[in-house]
């Protein structure tokens, strides 16, 4: 017997699905929208209680959408199925926030770079280095993670960075990495890596346009700071 509380067990005027159909999705709270996705609660919590406590316990939607499947399944009432639903919703949200109609994403300012990578990188618990490869019109043609771990100039080798750009016929590159602390202030190592890659790029004819450091909903551009 299924003892889990379902949306249909709620009074009809309290069911988020009914409210969405009648009034539109925009009137629903975050908890109600999440309840529509998850559908069932537990034997001790109806789905609205579960959705509300889930958002509160993880610290809000941003934090909820950056949990791993292991972290989610440790939360009372969240099994593998619900964790997978949340992860899929999280990924769709990230992709939508960085989506532009058509297949082209042109970089004109550091903010364009931030808008492209922020959702993916701002809450990472480890440092990750991404390379954006651009064509002669500054349109992003390829993005790849090239390193995960603590960045320093002895580990981040220019060969690994520029090899991808050469293979993809890139005209220029932008590198991005995150600071798990949430503070995007460049470290001495960040500056050293930037200068080293800038120098190597000039030698092979693939310019390093910028190095963007991602923090918690903020970023620093090495180009804007005058480092390169």
Curated annotation (Swiss-Prot):
One Pfam family cited in the UniProt record for this chain: RadC
A biological process term (GO) from this entry: proteolysis
Keywords: Hydrolase, Metal-binding, Metalloprotease, Protease, Zinc
PROSITE patterns: MPN, UPF0758
Gene Ontology molecular functions: metal ion binding; metallopeptidase activity
SUPFAM superfamilies: JAB1/MPN domain, RuvA domain 2-like
Gene3D superfamilies: 5' to 3' exonuclease, C-terminal subdomain, Cytidine Deaminase, domain 2
Domain MPN: 106-228
Amino-acid positions noted as binding Zn(2+) in the UniProt annotation, renumbered to this chain: 177, 179, 190
Sequence motif JAMM motif, location on chain: 177-190
Family: Belongs to the UPF0758 family.
Name of the protein: UPF0758 protein CLK_2387
